[in-house]
Amino acid sequence: KYRVYNKQTQVAILAGMRFPTGQTNERDEFGFKLAADDQPGTGSWDPIMGLAISRPYKQMSFDANASYRLSNQGSQDTIAGDSFSYNLATTYNFKHTMIARHKLKPSLIIELNGIWQEQVEFNNLKDNNHGGTLIFLSPGLRLSLDDLAMNFSLGFPLLNDFNGLQPEAGIQLFTSLNWLI
């Protein structure tokens, strides 16, 4: 991650790698090996690149990020499909409150979260029932206590534009716990 900073706008260039850490040889109850797209891992090394931009304004901040994952061939001659994720967020930061010498700072957040997923490819054949675009509207709350931040949000699907026959996404609960070091 490379970060450019000034008082008005913060920009970060993101780069990373998704490592093949998940199992690729799981079997069903009858002993048959699961298809590659049903395995916990893909068995591929996938580079990720992206960009994040943030701009504070008074008690608010406006944030955007996007990243692209280039999927490589993994187990069972399968390519899980490239993906592109993108997020837009607005945060309203309330004034902090002191509680027993600890600074509590609540924030309200509203986000648009999107992901596009390419079709899975098995032995050079595309699976028409994989991939597509999904966009969520996600209102949420962040509670910061000194260097610890807890995030909670609900994602309501705005767009379920999947390829082929796939179940639609429902409401998602997102949580995170962050410690600033």
Q: Where do the language-model regions lie?
A:
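Outer-membrane pore/translocation modules
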Residues: 1-81, 144
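Outer membrane beta-barrel transmembrane domains
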Residues: 77-181
